[in-house]
């Protein structure tokens, strides 16, 4: 029976042809190949219509550790959930396709994970954080949203929406199977599922 990988990197995608031109997936694999632990990459697609899926399969053929998961267009929440639950890693990270947070930043998350934390999240609001190419109005909107979330649901978490979150195998199964806001994968026209991060962290806070 194959040994489960130490880390699963789950990358959701939707119409990513422009990002694929920037070799983002090659950069992910290049980093992982330098590590001394076993790994896999789950490319979980949200019903792309621009040729992304074909490119993902072509990329996966080059590496036995890379797998492609095709989903209906239901939005980021269900797409990430499908990938996280399909992953086999002892630890599972989901990260944005454009690698706005480079995968090497996981080294900062390991510091917390090694202190017996089962959920560790990235934050763009920490001292020294750099928001690459983010418009000022998006930053302001994000700050307003996070203030509202802190007030109503999850006090103490400065950035719920950063797409860089690490979960143990146990936490993954416990939390992602409890998601209700977008618990069922249904095809959507707008496919807006931004609230899934908030629900996920709310559940994690209850677990702590």
Task: Please place each PLM-identified region on the residue numbering.
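Cell-envelope/extracellular polymer assembly enzymes that use nucleotide-activated donors
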Residues: 6-8, 40, 199
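Donor nucleotide-sugar binding loop of glycosyltransferases
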Residues: 16-20, 48, 76, 102
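Catalytic donor-sugar/metal-binding loop of nucleotide-sugar-dependent glycosyltransferases
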Residues: 178-179, 198-208
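Short, well-formed alpha-helical segments that are part of the catalytic scaffolds
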Residues: 16-32
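Conserved donor nucleotide-binding strand/loop of the catalytic core
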Residues: 39-42, 53-86
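A conserved acidic beta->alpha catalytic loop
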Residues: 45-54, 99
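Acceptor/aglycone-binding surface of glycosyltransferases and processive sugar-polymer synthases
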Residues: 71-86, 91, 103-188, 194
